[in-house]
Every structure is written in structure tokens, then in C-alpha cells.
């Protein structure tokens, strides 16, 4: 399983495959990207390729993955701090925030499904510890405590990760940033309408009354709304990707939207738009 997620070149979602695609996209756009960011990405790709086996070894896996996180955050900081605020930057922000909103919803879904049932009285004391681990999965524990100033509770965590308008990795914050980017682009009215539908759905969700199956169903619908936003962006700004011509609707399978998101809103193609 670890090899499949980290090193399998036949898995387009593995870390190594993702790094390879990122490097290829960046290589075609070297005249647009900051030189320091391209050099760091290139060196990092070579380093990961040489040392990928350290991710398979339990003793060295944590350091390998930690280095990936730190390096990618460094590259993101370079792009954010040095790129001109032009169309290339705008489309890169579209891709970043769309992916953030989607991944936050997926992490909440998967991690919450693994939690022990709080309905069992003897397990209730452990509920806050479990939801604390969900926050830490998104590097959100400290920001949650600063914002909520209370102990970790299920409803508050869901409110923070799905609706908060200040935490950069919340779903709602990602949608807000998408709106800001889209207002700088032509022909964005249709996307803004679909984006508004997604934001209203999250804002009106009954978080306080959801059981675990209800939360899973809610996350599914959030992801489908996010897929609709992606599909509309792809339809308007990347029409060559929509071979069939029709935009998938809310009730269709979300896997199609996830696959398209990896291809059509990659940084390299976004910068070419």
C-alpha cells in the first residue's frame, strides 16, 4: 500500500508520479516561473527519485514525507512571494484553492470515518483526542485553538474545517479565494454562479445534527459541488479538454471530476491560458 501511494509510477496519484508531472509542467514554463522555484523543484525531484526507498522503510518514512511537505511549502511560498500578479498567477491560484477545498473535504471524510463511535459512553473521553488528530492532519490544530478558544469538539471542528473564513485550508475559505481569482478573469459569470451554489450549500449544512453516515453523505455532496466548479472552469477556459462537450451534473460520479482536475488545472496548463 505504501509503495502504491508513494512510489508506484503506474499510479497517477502517487507522490512520485505527481512530482514527475509537476516537474514536466514546470520545465515547459521555465521562462514564467521564478528561477529559484524551478531549480528547487528540479533538485527535489532528483532527490526523491534517488531516495524513494526510504519512504518504504518504516524507520525513515516520516523524515522522507516531512521533507516533501517542507519542500513543497517552500516552493508554494516562492511562487506566492515572487510571481507577477498576472493570468499565470491567477490560474495557479484557481488550481491551488480548488484542490485545497477538495482535499480538505476528503481528509475530513476519511479521518472522521476512522474515529471510534462517540455514542459508546466509555469512548466519549477520547472524542476530543480523535478530532484533534483530524485537525493535525490539516495543520489546523493551533489555528483552531486560537480561533475557537475552547476544547476540541466535533461540531466546532467541522465548523472550522468546512466553514471558517480565516483558515486557509477550510473549504469555505478556498471557495472565497476562488471567487476573488475569478473576478479578475473574463467570462466568469457562469462559474461564479456555480461557486455560489457550493458556498451556500456548505453554509446551510446542518453540522450540529449530523451522525457519521450523514456526515459522509454531506461530504459527498460538497465534493460534487466542487467538481461542478472545476467542470465549469474547464469548460470555459480549457475547452479542448471537454471532448464530449457536456458538463457533468451534480449527481454524476465524482471520480471524473477528480481526474480532470489533475489534468486541466495543473499549474503548467493554467499558466499557458
Language model features with spans:
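Alpha-helical transmembrane segments and their helix-helix packing motifs
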Residues: 1-273
Amino acid at each position: 500500500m505504501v509503495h502504491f501511494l508513494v512510489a508506484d509510477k503506474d499510479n497517477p496519484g502517487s507522490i512520485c508520479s505527481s512530482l514527475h508531472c509537476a516537474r514536466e509542467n514546470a520545465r515547459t514554463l521555465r521562462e514564467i516561473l521564478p528561477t529559484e522555484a524551478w531549480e528547487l523543484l528540479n533538485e527535489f525531484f532528483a532527490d526523491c527519485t534517488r531516495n524513494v526507498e526510504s519512504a518504504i522503510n518504516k524507520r525513515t518514512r516520516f523524515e522522507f514525507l516531512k521533507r516533501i511537505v517542507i519542500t513543497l511549502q517552500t516552493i508554494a511560498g516562492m511562487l506566492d512571494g515572487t510571481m507577477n500578479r498576472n493570468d499565470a498567477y491567477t490560474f495557479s491560484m484557481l488550481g491551488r484553492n480548488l484542490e485545497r477545498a477538495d482535499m480538505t473535504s476528503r481528509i475530513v471524510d476519511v479521518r472522521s470515518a476512522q474515529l471510534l463511535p462517540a455514542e459508546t459512553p466509555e469512548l466519549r473521553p477520547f472524542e476530543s483526542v480523535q478530532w484533534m488528530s483530524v485537525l493535525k492532519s490539516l495543520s489546523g490544530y493551533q489555528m483552531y485553538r486560537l480561533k475557537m478558544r475552547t476544547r476540541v469538539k466535533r461540531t466546532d471542528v467541522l465548523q472550522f474545517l468546512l466553514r471558517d473564513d480565516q483558515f486557509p485550508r477550510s473549504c469555505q475559505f478556498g471557495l472565497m479565494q476562488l471567487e476573488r481569482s475569478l473576478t479578475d478573469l473574463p467570462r466568469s459569470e457562469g462559474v461564479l454562479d456555480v461557486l455560489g451554489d457550493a458556498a451556500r450549500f456548505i453554509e446551510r449544512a446542518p453540522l450540529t445534527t449530523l451522525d457519521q453516515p450523514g456526515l459522509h453523505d454531506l461530504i459527498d455532496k460538497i465534493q460534487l459541488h466542487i467538481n461542478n466548479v472545476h467542470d465549469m472552469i474547464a469548460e470555459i477556459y480549457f475547452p479542448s479538454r471537454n471532448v464530449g462537450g457536456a458538463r457533468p451534473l451534480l449527481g454524476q460520479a465524482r471520480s471524473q471530476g477528480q481526474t480532470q482536475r489533475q489534468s486541466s488545472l495543473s499549474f503548467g496548463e493554467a499558466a499557458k491560458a
